[in-house]
Curated annotation (Swiss-Prot):
One of its GO terms (biological process) is negative regulation of TOR signaling. One of its GO terms (cellular component) is cytoplasm. It comes from the Eukaryota. Belongs to the TNFAIP8 family. The gene is tnfaip8l1. This is Tumor necrosis factor alpha-induced protein 8-like protein 1. It is found in: Cytoplasm. It comes from Danio rerio (Zebrafish). PANTHER family: TUMOR NECROSIS FACTOR ALPHA-INDUCED PROTEIN 8-LIKE PROTEIN 1, TUMOR NECROSIS FACTOR INDUCED PROTEIN.
């Protein structure tokens, strides 16, 4: 039997296209305005923290690729039942992470970087498990690159610290995340 499948070919083409075109313009086709604003703030705070524009761009580009590829796989029904259960656990963990991030911002003296870091690392592991058979080692490395940055305890402590520079970014991030939660997008 011939193993050629146009559906698989189209999916491979979509994944390849997404990996080559993870620019802001293309992301806007897949990511709504609020998400885009949150990503912009994550870029700004990352650039401020790393003092490296190129590294900040790479982290956000990898984040966008990760989100878009996950969406392509999900919309094309590529996950088996076990993987769908992992995706659902990932979605719930991201929801918990978002609620925790906003809560830590809104309620003074509640921030715990270990809690945030652990939630982010839990998300990373669930994502790796869900996409394991679908994406390349390079995609897994991108996931690690993104999560290594955002789960870094020093980064989190700086982001949630008293510095007015970071406070402004955190406020905009949390306002966007809160809006996404209200709209059921997280």
């Amino acid at each position: 039997m011939d193993s050629f499948s146009t559906k698989n070919l189209a999916l491979q083409a979509q994944k390849k296209l997404m990996s080559k075109m993870a620019t802001k313009t293309v992301a806007n086709l897949f990511i709504d305005d609020t998400s885009s604003e949150v990503l912009d703030e994550l870029y700004r705070v990352t650039k401020e923290y790393t003092r490296n524009r190129k590294e900040a761009q790479k982290i956000i580009k990898n984040l966008i690729k990760m989100v878009v590829k996950l969406g392509v796989l999900y919309r094309n029904g590529q996950f088996n039942n076990e993987e769908l259960a992992l995706v659902e656990r990932f979605r719930k963990k991201v929801h918990t992470l978002a609620m925790t991030a906003v809560s830590f911002y809104q309620i003074d003296f509640t921030f715990d970087r270990r809690v945030m870091s652990n939630l982010l690392n839990d998300c990373r592991e669930l994502l790796h498990q869900a996409i394991n058979r679908h994406l390349t080692a390079k995609s897994h490395a991108r996931i690690n690159h993104v999560f290594n940055h955002f789960a870094d305890c020093d980064f989190l402590a700086t982001l949630y610290g008293p510095s007015e520079v970071y406070r402004g970014h955190l406020q905009k991030i949390c306002e966007g995340v809160n809006k996404m939660l209200d709209e059921g997008n997280l």
